[in-house]
Amino acid sequence: AQIREALDAAQKEQDRPTLIIGKTVMGKGALRADGTSYEACINTHGAPLGGDAYVNTIKHLGGDPENAFVIFDDVKELYAKRAEELKKIVAERKAAEAEWRKANPEKAALMDEWFSGKAPKVDWSKVEQKAGSATRAASAACLGVLAEQVPNMICASADLSNSDKTDGFLKKTKSIVRGDFSGAFFQAGVAELTMADMCIGMMLHGGVVAAMGTFFVFSDYMKPAVRLAALMQIPVKFIWTHDAFRVGEDGPTHEPVEQEAQIRLMEKLKNHAGKD
């Protein structure tokens, strides 16, 4: 009930993100072989319950160790009731969508295209590259064209849009700000992992194309999210600039020495590096 209440509140909130914190108990209801509580014990995290601990735990939770996967009658009843509720909700939403589609055929066709997962159509001949320009400047030229031609694209940067040159995209749109979501650029602040999570979440929802930029060395902060995105094969775009071993006055803290090897070794992540 508390989870449902939190989700309902989150869905009603239209102006700001909602953080739901679920406090759990490790090994809830588990008992050791001697019958003492196994709750909140570190061992339950990495090892399965076995022997008498397994038997005691199943009994403690109201089940039969000889037939542990039986679904309780009250659970069956709860799920059956919820299934009927969901059928009604789905029918109402499908009817509402059908009415909307009938009244908005052009928008409906556009929505279908955006949610199809197909690559957007881009006229790359519109990209103008200057000879000898830095790779991040070349990226900015491409992003500017994408901002103009891909209306469902969102680009983000971790407080570095003027340096990683994702501002090539920003200059053709405006930032998303509180109370105004009409822009297509998300200024994430110094929060690389959060930025990655949000862009990946957008891609999982569907309907948008998400890309984000920061210095290559800061890919370290994003690594857990990048790895999961790669394993899940989510086509989100990571733009990492300043990828040379020497990055001038910023010094060793900003020099990506080992990051390239880490990223190239990551399974299912496609790497494209423009270098001479």
Residue ranges and their predicted role:
Residues 76-276:
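Thiamine diphosphate
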Residues 1-81, 251, 259, 265-276:
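Glycine-rich ThDP/TPP pyrophosphate-binding loop and its adjacent helix/strand module
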